[in-house]
Amino acid sequence: MKRLLFISFLFIGCQNISTEIIVDPDVEDMYIRYNKAWSDGDFETITNEIYSVPFSLYLQDSTVILDSSEDIKNFLIMTFNELESNNYGYSIRNSWESYKIDDNLVIVEQNFTRFLKDSTIMGPEERTASYILRKSEGKFQISGMVPHTTIAE
């Protein structure tokens, strides 16, 4: 009986082990810079350091390919203007939902929350977006994104 009880506790304890996803430190660093730049509406940093050309945006009903830095910059300016009109304040990452690395390619999903300027939650408490990253010249950049909610709301 004691043995059965011990095995039961061991089994229950194993079910509660955290499955926290650990990402490559270079990916983590890039996302810290990305989330800060996004929260600051810093389209220059995102255009020049975070997104790569071409950049693919996979929406629910279409795919948008941004073929130049100028296209990316214009897309970001339009997006940040819409966010500003919706009283957007900032975003925080809550967790990584998934992470897969294959040499110079990464597929990662980020769970995040957006806040209004008064620090109340903007829209859904938890949002997700999936990203395709490519390592080029020693650094990761985002080459594609699948937003699972509307980007500017």
PLM regions with names:
Residues 34, 46-47, 54-55, 72, ...:
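Hydrophobic pocket/interface hotspot
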Residues 34-38, 42, 50, 54, ...:
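Sec/Tat-exported extracytoplasmic proteins
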Residues 71-118:
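Surface-exposed, charged secondary-structure patches
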Residues 124-153:
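Short beta-strand edge/turn micro-motifs at domain boundaries
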